[in-house]
C-alpha cells in the first residue's frame, strides 16, 4: 500500500487512519507535491484508487514530464494530470478507479478532449459512471467514476472476460436520495 499527499495534515491523518486499521503503507519519508516530486517514481501498482482534488487550477506542470504520454494537461486544470499520473503508476495488468468532476467526461479546453480521445483509442477506459451532484460535503457538483484497465484481455485467474474495444457507460445521475437540502446519499435500493 502506497500513498502520497502534498498536505502535512492529510499525510498525518492517513498515517493515523492506517495505523488504527492495522495497515502498513509507504507514504514516503515526507509530504510532497506529486507533480513537483513523485515520491514513488518507480512504483507500478496492481490497483490505484484515488479521490484527487477536482479541477485544481493551482498545480505545478512540467511540459516534458514522462507521465504525459497521452498529451500535456492544461495549466488551469489538473484533472488529466491526475489521470495520467495514475496510468503511469499502473503495472502491465493494473487497474485504476477514481472520482473526478463530471466535466472530465466532456471538457475540450486546452487539449483535454485530445487526451481523453487518446485514452479511449488506446483502450484504457473500461467503465465510466456519471453520478449525481451533492454527494460530497465539500462541493455540490456532479461527479463521475473512471475505471481504467491497462489490459482488457480475458484473465480466467481474475475472473475477467475479454473486454477489448469495449467501454461500459453507466448513467447513475438520478440515483440516491436527498438527506437534507444540500446532501445526497446513494442507497442500496
Identify what each model region corresponds to.
Residues 38, 42-189:
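A conserved structural/catalytic subdomain of Rossmann-like adenosyl-cofactor enzymes
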Residues 2-7:
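Short, small-residue-biased leader/transition segments that mark boundaries at the very start
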Residues 9-43:
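S-adenosyl-L-methionine
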Amino acid at each position: 500500500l502506497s500513498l502520497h499527499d502534498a498536505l502535512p495534515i492529510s499525510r498525518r491523518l492517513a498515517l493515523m487512519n492506517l495505523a488504527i486499521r492495522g495497515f502498513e503503507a509507504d507514504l514516503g519519508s515526507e509530504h510532497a507535491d506529486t507533480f513537483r516530486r513523485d515520491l514513488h517514481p518507480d512504483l507500478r501498482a496492481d490497483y490505484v484508487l484515488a479521490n484527487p482534488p477536482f479541477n485544481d487550477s493551482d498545480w505545478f506542470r512540467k511540459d516534458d514530464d514522462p507521465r504525459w504520454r497521452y498529451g500535456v494537461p492544461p495549466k488551469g486544470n489538473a484533472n488529466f494530470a491526475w489521470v495520467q499520473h495514475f496510468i503511469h503508476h499502473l503495472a502491465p495488468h493494473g487497474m485504476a478507479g477514481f472520482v473526478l468532476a463530471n466535466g472530465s467526461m466532456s471538457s475540450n479546453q486546452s487539449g483535454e478532449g485530445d487526451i481523453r480521445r487518446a485514452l479511449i483509442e488506446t483502450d484504457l477506459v473500461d467503465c465510466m459512471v456519471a453520478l449525481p451532484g451533492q454527494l460530497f460535503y465539500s462541493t455540490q457538483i456532479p461527479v463521475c467514476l473512471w475505471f481504467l484497465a491497462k489490459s482488457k484481455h480475458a484473465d480466467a485467474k481474475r475472473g475477467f472476460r475479454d473486454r477489448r474495444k469495449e467501454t461500459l457507460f453507466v448513467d447513475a445521475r438520478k440515483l440516491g436520495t436527498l438527506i437534507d437540502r444540500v446532501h445526497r446519499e446513494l442507497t442500496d435500493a
